[in-house]
Amino acid sequence: MAPSHAWFDEVAVHWFTQYQLHLQLQEAVSYAHTQGVVLKGDIPIGVNRNSVDTWVAPELFHMDMQAGAPPDMFAVKGQNWELPTYNWDVIESTDFDWWKKRFQQMSCYFDTFRIDHILGFFRIWQIPMEQEEGIMGYLNPSVPLYVDEFESRGVWFDYERFTKPYITDHILWENFGEEADWVRQNCLYLEHGFAYRLKSEYLSQKAVKKLYEDGKISERVKWGLFDLISNVLLFEVPDSHGRQYYPRYGMEALSTFQALDESQKRVFRELSVEYFYRRQDAFWYQSGMRKLPALKRASNMLICGED
């Protein structure tokens, strides 16, 4: 950046500050080594959405996606870390240059380091930018489910039923109580004269959150709409032309699943288990082993990993 650039002064002060911190930390490291102390650093899998990295090299990231985690006993709706996910195809095309430079810089200060969420090098839980809850995510990369897998098991693939929020009068009452009529009149419309559908301004959790923040809906309506939006069985894989899908995590607890007939439940259960616990292992191994060995060779540090 040239000194004549409009942002030069604002950026240069950070260069100066970081360089001084670099010198101070190196001095501390040198002293620690004379005392026989080994230093261990820490590097998280993700970077802040508004970081210098995403500003300088946005092509290395999926800025329209968010990293997070699926539901567990501590977070029933999953986690949304709001960090962009990596565009590994672009990163790999540069021989992992950005990641190698990160490790090499860390080696100026540390003898060993921990990769926080090392599983992210194999796969990441990815949530579309327009959604808020981790439950709206899926594993990326992953081998999806195909329409043929449902049909070969005797289930006719009903796109509307399986991929759109399942909404009934009973569900509206459970979610909204006395505000159910208001939701029915303001947030929904009838498709084909019988199926409730969300109006366009209520299709995403992020849009609903904005309406709540603007004081246009109550907190109960916000959370109820979040639950309606997530009451689906499948997420369509982008650009798959309606042929590939990710199963919604924890679908068996949903009213949309409970409304299936028994043969449909069996097939959805089988395919969900197949997707989450069987078909990905070899694929994820190959995904991780394309990245980690190359990155390990970038420095002499001892690498530790945590899930």
Question: Which sequence ranges carry the predicted segments?
Answer:
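Catalytic cores of glycan-processing enzymes that make or break glycosidic bonds
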Residues: M1-D307
